Structure formats: C-alpha cells, structure tokens
C-alpha cells in the first residue's frame, strides 16, 4: 500500500487515532485489518452491545471510490436475503464514510472449487440453487449484479453461500437497457463485447451458466489470456462439452450460454428446467412484495431496557435508516434466529444432579429474552477483556440499565470459541448465548452456599471445612455449570469431508 494511504487510514488501535472515528469506536471494538485497497480499508470489529463480529469498510470521501461505494450501499439497503451479504449500518463523518457489513464466514467459491478440482453434480445443484435464489430475488427488485463470478460468492463448511460485492450492480426498470460495459471478461456475456445496449438480467444469466460450468468441470468454458481470442470464443459460443454429467445439465448449460440474449432463459424459466425441477421448493418468490417490518417485541423490550426508545426503534426499521438502532436490532434478530436453529439441532441434555446445594440465582435461556421486574439482561461476558476498554457509550448504556457492577456488560454472553488468526479464512463467530440473570448478587449467593455447607457439616457432626475446600467446591461448581452451558448453547458445526482431487477433463 502506498505510504500516503497508510497515513490517511492508520492501522486499527484500541482507541480512535482520529477524532472522526469516535462514532465508530463508541459502537464497535476494532480488532484488526482484514484487507485494504488504494482508497479503502476493511476492518474486523465487534459490536460492543452484542459481541457480534462485523466487517467495517472505511472509505475516504475525497477519493474516486466513495460515490460508487455509496451507490452500492443504497442498493444493498433494499436487499435482505439469506444468500446475500447484509448491510447493517451506514454513517459518514467530515472526511470518511463507514459501511458496517455482515462478516461472512467461509471461503470464496473459486478457492473451494480450485482446491477440489471440481464438484459432483448433486453438490453443484445445491450451490447453484442458492445462487439462483439470490439472483432471482435481485431481479425481482430490478437489481442486476453485473459481476457474478466465483470470486464474489462465499461458501462455508456447511455448503451455504452468500453473494458479495455489489459494487457494479445497478437498479433498472422492466425493459430498460444498459450501456455501461463492466465485469470480468471470462464471465462476460457476448453482448458486452459488441458494445451495444444490453439487458442486464440476461447478462447475469450468462454468468450463471459460466459459474455452473466451472463448478462441475473445474475450469471456465472460455479461457484465454489474450483478450481478442477470449472475445472470439465467447462470441462463437463454442465450449468443450463437460464429461460425466447428465444430459439435463448439459442442456441447461447450453441454454444459459446461448449467444443471442433473446433466446436466453429468464430466472423463472431456469427454475422450471428438468435439472432443477422438484428442487426449487423454498426459493424466494421474486414476485412477492417485501413484508412490512414488524419488530420482535422481545428484542424491542430488550433494547428499551438498555435505554433505546421503542418509537425510535420502529422508526429506524420502517424508514430503513440503517443507523445505530437498526444495526443493534438486526444483530439481535440474527442471534435469535441462529439460537433457534441450533436449539433444534442440539440433542436433549439430561439434568446433572450435583452432590452439593444448587444455586437458584437464575436460569439461562437459549431461545428467548426473558424479562421481569427484578431481572437484568446485562449478563457477564468474557469479552471485552477489561472494563477500562469500554467506551463511554457502553458505560452510559449500563448506567441507563441501572447496573453498577464492576463486571463487563454485554447484552448477551459471548461464546469463547474464537477462531485463531492462522486460519485460511475468517469465520463468523459463534453467536452469543441469550441470558436472563437474576438480580441476586454474587455475594448473597456465596453466603448462601457457605451457609448450606455449614448446615451439612453440622448435621453430620463434622467440623466445617476450611475456606480452601469451599473454594475448591465453588470452582468445581463453575466447571460443571460451564460444561452444561457449553452443551446447551455451543454445539460446534461439523465440517464436511474434503472432496476428491480428481479433475474432469473437458472433451476436445
């Protein structure tokens, strides 16, 4: 990176090095840099209230990339789909713009296929269906991506995908043609090389055909380092037929990579193709109008408890402000959804009977936020590591909640299963557990436990054990409790086995 860029966008630190970063650091803890370009930088950060990791794109407003990035943000504000990366928050200062994005786990589809050689037809179908669902959703909103390629598709170890990078996307009305020619050459449709107006939805469908071919073969159908030669191949529309695949798949590939866009199918027609027929249940209905936002009352109550106003929360959501309140709401909503999914997958754990008096001081809930007159939803957390690192914003939140504890206050307890930095890709952190803790203090719990232990010793006509013995019991209690909590809330995901390394050689 050039030296002057490093000066303008300094490396992350626990405290803001620029006064304009105050708003960012008041809501997020900046961890480290994920990547950088000439005029922008992407940071890994954690949301102070929930502990959820996010990606922060920092842009310089006086640079050429700023306006395209804001255009991308305006398009992403209209999108909410499980197979598309989510935009959480947007704000600007005098010289910078900040895009808070969902942190996507996994690796690029390009790297996934490259490491495997190719993937089998059934797996390719499952991945392609997710891509098709996202593209059909966008086309239903009048949004064309224009840069669909394996590099812009992320896949995790469960086979779930998310489309990223809407930097070249645009919104059109039905029947509108585009004049701007952009995207990767190898995935560009023939009409892009003719330098004429084109239908953006049809060019997206061509790119889908190239992606599908790449998945089952392991290489792109049109390949040349010489641009004129690559252009000649694409305009001719002739490519090596894939080996070892069904006739239905071959037919779908030929339809998607039809040179004349007038005869190229739409997303709706692709879904009806025999290769996909019977597998499209559950895909997003592209003709369905967006459902009006109805905030979850449990989440609204929790946010009210820490000082937000219900009216402001609803206004932020309905008017799509993408501000601090809407970001907090969406992060809590995603945690609740993940918790529900994991609870359905987790096996039933029988209760463990301890040989010592049990504590009645609160029960952890993994599904819903419970609130009562004496309950506090600010639970203890293992992150952040020190109360001194909390910004004034978080401390004010705790004061509004009426909590004067020396412990760290997050809305949910963060999971300790943190990925190491030497992994090949950044995984999205495990969602924290939702807690409903009692207002009984730790001192009163400790006093009751010692009192109960004293009664047991007197009943057996034995002297009371030393404090060291009591502390050992307390440590044992905490270990058992942590083990039970881990079983209930932290079921790790299973990794899919590695695919074979054999490659399919295209027919000449």
From Swiss-Prot:
EC number(s) given by UniProt:
2.7.11.1
Gene Ontology MF terms: ATP binding; protein serine kinase activity; protein serine/threonine kinase activity
Pinpoint the UBA domain residues: 294-334
Keywords for this protein = ATP-binding, Kinase, Nucleotide-binding, Serine/threonine-protein kinase, Transferase
Instruction: Report whether Kinase shows up as a keyword of the record.
Output: yes
Taxonomy, superkingdom? Eukaryota
**Which PROSITE patterns does the record cross-reference, listed alphabetically?**
PROTEIN_KINASE_ATP, PROTEIN_KINASE_DOM, PROTEIN_KINASE_ST, UBA
Q: What class of enzyme is it?
A: transferase
What does the record give as the reaction this protein catalyses?
A: L-seryl-[protein] + ATP = O-phospho-L-seryl-[protein] + ADP + H(+); L-threonyl-[protein] + ATP = O-phospho-L-threonyl-[protein] + ADP + H(+)
Protein kinase domain ranges (all copies):
28-276
Catalytic center at which residues?
Answer: 147
Residues that hold ATP according to the record:
34-42, 57
InterPro entries, per this entry?
Kinase-like_dom_sf (IPR011009), Prot_kinase_dom (IPR000719), Protein_kinase_ATP_BS (IPR017441), Ser/Thr_kinase_AS (IPR008271), UBA (IPR015940)
Family note: Belongs to the protein kinase superfamily. CAMK Ser/Thr protein kinase family. Smok subfamily.
Q: Report further notes.
A: Encoded on the T-complex, a region of 20-30 Mb on proximal third of mouse chromosome 17. Naturally occurring variant forms of the T-complex, known as complete t-haplotypes, are found in wild mouse populations. The t-haplotypes contain at least four nonoverlapping inversions that suppress recombination with the wild-type chromosome, and lock into strong linkage disequilibrium loci affecting normal transmission of the chromosome, male gametogenesis and embryonic development.
Q: PANTHER family, from UniProt?
A: MAP/MICROTUBULE AFFINITY-REGULATING KINASE (PTHR24346), SPERM MOTILITY KINASE 3A (PTHR24346:SF95)
What does the function comment of this entry state? Answer: May play a role in sperm motility, especially in the regulation of flagellar function.
**Identification of the protein by name:** Sperm motility kinase Y
Organism of origin? Mus musculus (Mouse)
